[in-house]
Amino acid sequence: MASKASSLGSVSTGNFTPAPPKKGALSGTKEFLESNSIVAKIAFLLLVLIAFIIILRLGIQIISYFMAPSSSPTVLSGMTDANHMHIIPQNPALPHSIPILRSINQQDGIEFTWGVWTFIKNLKPENRYKHVFHKGNNKVDNDLGMNFPNNAPGLYIAPHTNNFVIVMNTFDKIKEEIIVEDIPLNKWICVIIRVENHNLDVYINGVIVKRHVLASVPKQNYGDVYVSMNGGYNGYTSTLKYWNTALDVSQIQRFVNAGPDLAMKEKDMTQSEPRYFSLRWFFQNPEMDYGGL
């Protein structure tokens, strides 16, 4: 029986070798990475480098968004006695610094805007300027009352008058002055100083009252911001703000509508004073110069 052959033929009893599995995407990638081809290695390194650059740029943008100084910081918050001096450092390494970003030159040239609220109680007859604020160095002439040489810009009250004097440095002239006359007392007044290319515009409570064409390009500086130097003036200063662009009319009006920040530690009756003055001032002031507007 054991020697009988099957009618279907003999069956081999040798070793059976299974067919190798088909290579999929993973095995193909492995072969690609393990190959000795220089082209394959260079291509892989390029892919890694591109991915690293993309991730790095995204990371820098995210960090800059959260860590970079604001382009429109509030330099002085709340209401302060205008007889008390404040210094706002520009060195980011110093505590309580509020860096002012220089203007980003647009198609029309350099541009930036400063805004501040002032409340002038009364003016004593003095032979020197009264300091509201300026950005620059710390060298006020005690007799004159004006800082020199850096004012970019500077806002002062002229001697023996209730006139505002705006001072701006340019590359051709160390000091250019713009005068706004007959500022009312005992009223909150919003002063906007707007620079666009060679034009310096002054707005009082949202209305343009002066346009001055500067002799040359405005000269910004890296100096600190000073408020109420040399005794300041008798009154209050509130909400000093900077923008590194030239505000449009709607943005200026939005700042005016927000009003002064009256938050102050000591209580004061100025919160009950009228915020604005009569429109009659705009129409009865014959010295207004709109620069051809």
Where are these regions (language model features)?
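Extracellular glycan-associated modules
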Residues: 1-293
